[in-house]
């Protein structure tokens, strides 16, 4: 009997109750959690409505692919806010007494799986969007003829399934997700790293996240350079790149938001995976980095809400009036058909165009 009682005391929740040095103000945290969850859900709902309307409106194959991937990213952010936010509010409302409402560690495991999935999936989708746009700009004929909506849906499903697999890895390896030191969220084991497997999960998550950011940076750089080269090579075919310009601006904004919000958390997890977690300072740094990462799911939808063609046109007009400088003609924002885009692509990629440009 005494052995059974001692085993019951060493539950995942109880083990952390004796070492809770990283605390948060409960009332304030409940208030901010509710506000964050509400703002995130409303923002993502508005972005989903805008993207779905745009997907129905535009029948350009290149733009439809981008909008489909963007919709997947925003929907992932929406459910991440809904599920993770609801669990976080419940935890705060229960005074963070995990041992009282989650003795079997089921809720913590669900929380941890959702945290990993909703963190990794948008990063991977952002890199896939950057690759798709890079192919669409550098190889537009191949993109228009070979990459169909069916292929894009398969890529979207593949990314989601891969993120689910990574999130389920600890469960498949008979490892539990752990309550973190602040007792407000669950993730991989960061407190008492025992062996290589604990380090592996942390390093794998960090590596995949940083790799996704690196791929996005590289592909967006190639896309931007290609658009600039085409611009200087053939001034008369500007209108064929208007939809490219809008999507590239959105991609750059998504990449900047992801880098700023996710880099601290990914680097912190990598550091814990390599060096371990031995200080209160590491706990506070992790909590700050987590809050930064949470902002990513709030800011992502506003990229599609604010950086639409109509809004960009108005911003351009306002900037032109204030500065008195016309960098580009306003007709670059006018809608162009896929026929014009393919025409520009054919001209810019043909040997004749190269020859005429050189002369």
From Swiss-Prot:
Keyword annotations of the record: Cell membrane, Disulfide bond, G-protein coupled receptor, Glycoprotein, Membrane, Receptor, Transducer, Transmembrane, Transmembrane helix
A GO CC term attached to the entry: extracellular region
Annotated protein name in UniProt: Prostaglandin F2-alpha receptor
Organism: Homo sapiens
Transmembrane portions of the chain: 32-54, 70-90, 110-131, 153-175, 199-224, 251-267, 286-307
Primary gene name: PTGFR
Assembly with partners or alone: Isoform 1 can form heterodimers with isoform 5 (and probably other isoforms).
Chief localisation class: membrane
Subcellular location: Cell membrane
Function description: Receptor for prostaglandin F2-alpha (PGF2-alpha). The activity of this receptor is mediated by G proteins which activate a phosphatidylinositol-calcium second messenger system. Initiates luteolysis in the corpus luteum. Isoforms 2 to 7 do not bind PGF2-alpha but are proposed to modulate signaling by participating in variant receptor complexes; heterodimers between isoform 1 and isoform 5 are proposed to be a receptor for prostamides including the synthetic analog bimatoprost.
GO molecular function: prostaglandin F receptor activity
């Amino acid at each position: 009997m005494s052995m059974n009682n001692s085993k019951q005391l060493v539950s995942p929740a109880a083990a952390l109750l004796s070492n809770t040095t990283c605390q948060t103000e409960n009332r304030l945290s409940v208030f901010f959690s509710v506000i964050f969850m509400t703002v995130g859900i409303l923002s993502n709902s508005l972005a989903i409505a805008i993207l779905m309307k745009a997907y129905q409106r535009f029948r350009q194959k290149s733009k439809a692919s981008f909008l489909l991937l963007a919709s997947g990213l925003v929907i992932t952010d929406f459910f991440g806010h809904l599920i993770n936010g609801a669990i976080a509010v419940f935890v705060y409302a229960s005074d963070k007494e995990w041992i009282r409402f989650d003795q079997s560690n089921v809720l913590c495991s669900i929380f941890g799986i959702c945290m990993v999935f909703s963190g990794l999936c948008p990063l991977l989708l952002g890199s896939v969007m950057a690759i798709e746009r890079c192919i669409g700009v550098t190889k537009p004929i191949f993109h228009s003829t070979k990459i169909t909506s069916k292929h894009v849906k398969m890529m979207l499903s593949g990314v989601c399934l891969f993120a689910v697999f990574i999130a389920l890895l600890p469960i498949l390896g008979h490892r539990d997700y752990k309550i973190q030191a602040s007792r407000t969220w669950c993730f991989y084991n960061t407190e008492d790293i025992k062996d290589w497997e604990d380090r592996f999960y942390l390093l794998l998550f960090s590596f995949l996240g940083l790799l996704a950011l690196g791929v996005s940076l590289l592909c967006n750089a190639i896309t931007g350079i290609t658009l600039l080269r085409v611009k200087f090579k053939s001034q008369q075919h500007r209108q064929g790149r208007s939809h490219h310009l809008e999507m590239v601006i959105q991609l750059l904004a998504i990449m900047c938001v992801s880098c700023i919000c996710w880099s601290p958390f990914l680097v912190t997890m990598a550091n814990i995976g390599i060096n371990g977690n031995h200080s209160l300072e590491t706990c506070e740094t992790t909590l700050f980095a987590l809050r930064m990462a949470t902002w990513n799911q709030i800011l992502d939808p506003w990229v599609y809400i604010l950086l639409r063609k109509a809004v960009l046109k108005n911003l351009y007009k306002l900037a032109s009036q204030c500065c008195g400088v016309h960098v580009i003609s306003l007709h670059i924002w006018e809608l162009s058909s896929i026929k014009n885009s393919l025409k520009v692509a054919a001209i810019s990629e043909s040997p004749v165009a190269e020859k005429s440009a050189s002369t």
